[in-house]
């Protein structure tokens, strides 16, 4: 009978960026927002050429239950709603925004204070997560609100924060846990999952 030697193969982890702090990049001249940047139905554009947007402006509505809204991460003017070739080589609809400064929607709280106490019900929190277009950071960008809706009569008994990267070169989750741990651990308490 053939057997394997003890020890196995240990390929390089390629985590060269694990020790590097998160950096803010310079603004581009134009930002392109694909409407299919998550699993499920693509979002539907709600802006048109010439519209002025700010950071935090909703630019696309979720196109179905398994879909996500999209918000602008730049301020500027919508140049066009057209198509772009995605990473897989397919032509997909997208919103093109010419960047003009750094204005934020007035309704966005940019303070460094974290929410310490939440007075919303779990259902209200899930609705806000859906409205905000929150998706997972994995390759599928799965809409988070879908995962937070257990079947009727069921209740979550524990929360597992999966920070295992799906690709060998990725270290974004690792850096977020190191630099933003206080924000990550605020979320379970908001759902009443901290007891």
Write out the residue ranges for each language-model feature.
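Well-ordered alpha-helical segments embedded in enzymatic catalytic cores
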Residues: 183-187
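Well-ordered secondary-structure scaffolds
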Residues: 1-182, 193-195
């Amino acid at each position: 009978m053939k057997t394997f030697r003890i020890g196995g193969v240990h390929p390089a982890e390629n985590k060269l960026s694990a020790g590097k702090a998160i950096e803010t990049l310079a603004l581009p001249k134009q930002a392109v927002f694909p409407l299919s940047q998550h699993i499920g139905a693509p979002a539907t554009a709600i802006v048109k050429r010439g519209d002025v947007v700010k950071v935090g402006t909703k630019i696309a509505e979720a196109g179905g239950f398994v879909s996500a809204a999209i918000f602008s991460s730049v301020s500027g003017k919508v140049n066009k709603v057209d198509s772009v070739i995605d990473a897989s080589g397919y032509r997909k609809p997208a919103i093109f925004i010419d960047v003009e400064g750094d204005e934020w929607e007035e309704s966005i709280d940019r303070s460094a204070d974290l929410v310490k106490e939440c007075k919303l019900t779990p259902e209200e929190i899930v609705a806000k997560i859906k409205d905000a277009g929150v998706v997972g950071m994995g390759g599928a960008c799965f809409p988070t609100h879908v995962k937070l809706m257990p079947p009727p009569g069921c209740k979550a008994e524990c929360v597992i924060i999966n920070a295992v990267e799906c690709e060998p070169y990725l270290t974004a989750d690792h850096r977020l846990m190191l630099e933003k741990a206080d924000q990550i651990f605020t979320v379970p308490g908001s759902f009443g999952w901290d007891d």
